[in-house]
Every structure is written in C-alpha cells, then in structure tokens.
Regions:
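Bacterial Sec-dependent N-terminal signal peptides
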Residues: 1-22
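Extracellular/lumen-exposed scaffold segments
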Residues: 18-153
C-alpha cells in the first residue's frame, strides 16, 4: 500500500503545482470613504499578461460575464450598480461568434454603498468570473470576498 501511495505522489504534486499555475488573476479588496456615510468598495482584478476577464455586460449566449452577489447586511445600503474602471477592449470573438467586452491587465470593479449606522461591519459576497487568453478559457470561478468598513479609521 505504501509503495502504491508513493508511486502516485509525483502525480499529485504535479497536479497541485499545475492547479496553482492556472490562476492568472489575483483579486484585492478595499473600502474607501468618499464622504460622510458613503463608501466605495473596490474589487480589483490584476491579470497575468495575455489573459482577460469579461465585462459584466455580456449577452446570455456568450461567455460568463463577471458578476457580483452581495450578502445581505442590514447596516449597508447599495447605491447604484457595480461600475467598471479600466481599459475596456471590444473585439469580435470567433469562438463565441459575437462582439465581446473585456479587460486585460487590470480592472477595478466599484460598488458605492451607504453605511446606515456609524459602526464597523463586513461586506461579504462572491464574484463569478471567467478568464481567457488567445488559446483557451478557464472554467468560471466563484470567489468569496469580505471587505471591512470601519468609520473610525
């Protein structure tokens, strides 16, 4: 049994290393007070060269658009929709047979919120996104996030 486990060990190590290499996007999260009880939540994607992430504005028959779901929080009220800040590219994609909007390098997704009571809280949720390069697309991912809002800082 021990020999069997040892014979498969290199395979598992290779698979683990390969899985880590196939994560060409890094997410960071922050909150910025803009005035009084208003804040901006920043969910920023930094992509490795040649990779891109799709806009939130993609038709249903295309790739998976980037989307955000925020957990309910009685201390927070969203103000508008998530906006995109970055260099948006628009290009016809022959694989999907349509014009697509996407971002390379970096994109900052911003949600404005109002803090109803001046106490610290966490805004939690999940991001769903899909990334591609010129050779392949990775399966859609769901990534949980948590952003601390503290009116005292």
């Amino acid at each position: 049994m021990k020999k069997l486990i040892l014979s498969f060990l290199p395979f598992f190590l290779f698979a683990a290393a390969f899985a880590q290499m196939e994560n060409p996007v890094k997410w960071t999260y922050s909150a910025k007070k803009i005035r009084g009880d208003m804040y901006e939540l920043h969910m920023t994607a930094v992509l490795e060269p040649k990779w891109h992430i799709y806009s939130q504005d993609i038709s249903d028959d295309g790739p998976v658009p980037t989307s955000f779901v925020f957990d309910k929080n009685p201390l927070v009220k969203p103000d508008g929709k998530v906006t995109e800040m970055g260099k948006q590219e628009k290009e016809y994609d022959k694989n999907f047979g349509m014009n697509l909007k996407y971002y390379g390098n970096k994109v900052d997704f911003v949600q404005k919120i109002k803090l109803k009571v001046a106490v610290a809280t966490l805004v939690k949720g999940k991001i769903t996104y899909m990334i591609c390069n010129d050779k392949k697309c990775l399966p859609p991912k769901n990534v949980p996030f948590s952003i601390k809002i503290d009116p005292r800082s």
